[in-house]
């Protein structure tokens, strides 16, 4: 099985991490871009043959996405499942997980993955049937983070949260009506941050399995933030509390 990836950051990240997955690489005919040329040189140095294509053909491959003049067909990457969780939890000293409940926009999924990678999150967990797919759009927005952060798809999110609790992971859910703010919460131990769908929030069962609910204090007239923005705010409060170093 193969899949399409596109954009300079997404292609470069996969080349650095797993060059064996590349099958074909196409670049825009006549494109002379100082950001693209070094990547082309790296691809050729890895033994890949670069093919030239028209803008119309490249556009047809990316479903309206911004390809930046480069599209690649690659072998599908590893698919993480819920049975991968125990080994992951045992492999890190202080697990830091992100759970997305009902984030169905691939742009938001990609942005959350990018923030998760920057914040040092060990894995992102999503429900199999109520989540955006990790498609080419999500990978483009993630700017390479999709190759670094495991995306674990689970059949039953509530059951997965129970498994995390059995491994002493504290479940922190976000809810606009919560009296306790993220700045009042201690988030230095093993934890999973749960973000709900924009507008709807977490589902009832997901909320019931949280150990703690927190909110983001809002000073202006807007009542909520885009889910990817809210995710970034919460993740980096955890980073601040933990004093993580680059």
Curated annotation (Swiss-Prot):
Species this protein is from: Yersinia pestis
Function (record text): Specifically methylates the ribose of guanosine 2251 in 23S rRNA.
SMART domains for the chain: SpoU_sub_bind
Subunit and interaction comment: Homodimer.
Keyword Transferase (UniProt): yes
GO terms of molecular function: RNA binding; rRNA (guanosine-2'-O-)-methyltransferase activity
Keyword entries, A-Z: Cytoplasm, Methyltransferase, rRNA processing, S-adenosyl-L-methionine, Transferase
Family as reported in the entry's similarity comment: Belongs to the class IV-like SAM-binding methyltransferase superfamily. RNA methyltransferase TrmH family. RlmB subfamily.
Keyword Cytoplasm: yes
Enzyme category, top tier: transferase
Predominant subcellular localization, coarse grouping: cytoplasm
Alphabetized InterPro entries for the sequence: 23S_rRNA_MeTrfase_RlmB, Alpha/beta_knot_MTases, Ribosomal_eL30-like_sf, rRNA_MeTrfase_TrmH, SpoU_MeTrfase, SpoU_subst-bd, tRNA_m1G_MTases_N
Name used for this protein in its record: 23S rRNA (guanosine-2'-O-)-methyltransferase RlmB
Catalytic activity: guanosine(2251) in 23S rRNA + S-adenosyl-L-methionine = 2'-O-methylguanosine(2251) in 23S rRNA + S-adenosyl-L-homocysteine + H(+)
Superkingdom per UniProt: Bacteria
A single cellular component GO annotation: cytosol
Subcellular location field: Cytoplasm
E.C. number: 2.1.1.185
Chain residues that bind S-adenosyl-L-methionine: 196, 216, 225
